[in-house]
Curated annotation (Swiss-Prot):
Protein name: Pectinesterase 3
Organism phylogeny: Eukaryota, Viridiplantae, Streptophyta, Embryophyta, Tracheophyta
Family as reported in the entry's similarity comment: In the N-terminal section; belongs to the PMEI family.
Residue positions with a glycan: 108, 129, 226
Function statement: Acts in the modification of cell walls via demethylesterification of cell wall pectin.
GO molecular function, one term: enzyme inhibitor activity
């Protein structure tokens, strides 16, 4: 550094002694450009030298907090980011005494980054040359960022109580669910700008901030998994038995569904709080109006009966509307229908006829429909981001992207899902049990994909599980199914995870079973499993030979994908009142 200073001193003296006005114009420009460049280089070197000097004069790497931080970050996918983000916090050494402290600090730093992104998006919305879809996509980003902030705050609160208040396994599943959803939200924001080249300049303006938050969430998730896995292993070893809560079941229902909610889902006589009737005979004429009038943040079940009729509207159950239940008069009689789609300027996220985010949502005896048709591309009938949500005796009908299982824990039982391309997709931990899943006739040249699962990180506790169900074709596809190949799924994201087990698969499914997304993308990192399926399309001898595909022969391995294990079903499904099975 001293030599650089000496050089610039001599250079400055030389330029002062020489009459610059005598230098030819072209040489003068070259001289000034060179001088400016060297100044920048010197400044950069000075900054780096200063940082190194501070590092050398400060923490020598032998301090206890340094070892804890380094050890914690070693379990992450982005250890350098993990370490540098926390090490940059003033007086970090006084705050880090355990891995739990490292995780909490990481969550707080991530929250600050998310808030920064929020303000950046608000600034972008002020641009005057935005297209319709860009505006919609930016509002999607504001919504998902708002949800991310809630998830991070909940994670910090849950972490502060860890390992008390709840069982270890419940703590682990709740924390991993929150961080998995927070990660998913970042990708959802960027996905809204991927429909055409015209809106990618806006995506570029957002990308760095969203990807940074996604990586920070990934690091927190990895550390949470490492901490909870270690603690649970210690408990199992010390008790010499499995954790009690891991084997608990309630009549085959996940335990997060209370006995009361189980009755609500199965009972033929339920007293609603309000009634929706298109003919004016109820409290409201539209479903959206009934939701808007529902109490916010409710801890008690709020029941909305939707009488027979066709309701042409788009409905959003926001995060503020918790524990809402829709009860229809029958899946062929109560129909909520819309036609938003990507071709006409919507995003996939906003195209949903019904979108549900409020925790604890239940629905039974209703059809959710999007009538946009196969030529309109992505057009969602039902989007679900509500944690601990369940659907019973419902139909989801559309073409491309019918059912968007966006995030969090979800359960579908006795439902019909019909569509064409990627018609069950998203990154929730979703189990579909005893459902009818039917491919429809697509446009000429299209292939049908039953699933497109969006797991983007190996530590996310997400995936799509289809159990004890029936996979077939609708009446319009059956006569021509040879012209429209149908597959069980393709990998939307790098760590896509889908399991089909104990189900009946007809010959509508191509012998290869699964299809690529784009060349070799994700073929080594995905997890696609099949277990004890039957039917003309269930044979596995002709299946793909990808590293990520496997035929599951072990009942123990398959058990991990049942509702009791995969969506912590023993702690909540009992409350829905819907029929279900927790195990194999």
């Amino acid at each position: 550094m001293t030599r650089i200073k000496e050089f610039f001193t001599k250079l400055s003296e030389s330029s002062t002694n020489q009459n610059i006005s005598n230098i030819p114009k072209k040489k003068k420009k070259l001289f000034l450009a060179l001088f400016a460049t060297l100044l920048v280089v010197a400044a950069v070197i000075g900054i780096v030298a200063g940082v190194n000097s501070r590092k050398n004069s400060g923490d020598n790497g032998n301090e206890p907090h340094h070892a804890i931080l380094k050890s914690s970050c070693s379990s992450t996918r982005y250890p350098d980011l993990c370490f540098s983000a926390i090490a940059a916090v003033p007086e970090a050494s006084k705050k880090v005494t355990s891995q739990k402290d490292v995780i909490e600090m990481s969550l707080n730093i991530t929250t600050t980054a998310v808030e920064h992104n929020y303000f950046g998006i608000q600034k972008l919305l002020k641009r005057t040359n935005l297209t319709k879809r860009e505006k919609v996509a930016l509002h999607d980003c504001l919504e998902t960022i708002d949800e991310t902030l809630d998830e991070l705050h909940k994670a910090v609160e849950d972490l502060e109580e860890y390992p008390n208040k709840k069982s270890l396994s419940q703590h682990a599943d709740d924390l991993k669910t929150l961080m998995s959803a927070a990660m998913t939200n970042q990708g959802t924001c960027l996905d809204g700008f991927s429909h055409d080249d015209a809106n990618k300049h806006v995506r570029d303006a957002l990308s760095d901030g969203q990807v940074h938050v996604e990586k920070m969430c990934s690091n927190a998730l990895a550390m949470i998994k490492n901490m909870t896995d270690t603690d649970m292993m210690i408990m199992r070893t010390s008790n010499n038995r499995k954790l009690i809560e891991e084997t608990s079941t309630v009549d085959g229902w996940p335990a997060w569904l209370s006995t009361g909610d189980r009755r609500l889902l199965q009972s033929s006589s339920v007293t609603p709080n309000v009634v929706v009737a298109a003919d004016g005979s109820g409290n409201f004429k539209t479903v959206a109006a009934s939701v808007a009038a529902a109490p916010q943040g409710g801890t008690k079940r709020y029941i909305i009966r939707i009488k027979a009729g066709v309701y042409r509207e788009n409905v959003e159950v926001t995060k503020k509307h918790k524990n809402i239940m829709f009860i229809g008069d029958g899946r062929t009689r109560t129909i909520i229908t819309g036609s938003r789609n990507v071709v006409d300027g919507s995003t996939t996220f906003k195209s949903a006829t019904v979108a549900v985010v409020g925790e604890g949502f239940l629905a039974r005896d209703i059809t959710f429909q999007n009538t946009a048709g196969p030529s309109k591309h992505q057009a969602v009938a039902l989007r679900v981001g509500a944690d601990l949500s369940a659907f019973y005796n419902c139909d989801m009908l559309a073409y491309q992207d019918t059912l968007y299982v966006h995030s969090n824990r979800q359960f579908f039982v006795n439902c019909l899902i019909a569509g064409t391309v990627d018609f069950i997709f998203g990154n929730a931990a979703a189990v579909l049990q005893n459902c009818d899943i039917h491919a429809r006739k697509p446009n000429s040249g299209q292939k049908n994909m039953v699933t497109a699962q969006g797991r983007a990180d190996p530590n996310q506790n997400t995936g799509i599980v289809i159990q004890k169900s029936r996979i077939g074709a609708t009446s319009d596809l059956k006569p021509v199914q040879g012209s429209f190949p149908t597959y069980l799924g393709r990998p939307w994201k790098e760590y896509s995870r889908t399991v089909i087990m104990q189900s009946s698969i007809t010959d509508v499914i191509h012998p290869a079973g699964w299809h690529e997304w784009d060349g070799n993308f994700a073929l080594n990192t995905l997890f696609y499993g099949e277990h004890q399926n039957a039917g003309a399309g269930a044979g596995t001898s002709g299946r793909v030979k990808w590293k990520g595909f496997r035929v599951i022969t072990s009942a123990t391995e398959a058990q991990a994908f049942t509702p009791g294990s995969f969506i912590a079903g023993s702690s909540w499904l009992g409350s829905t009142g819907f029929p279900f099975s927790l195990g194999l």
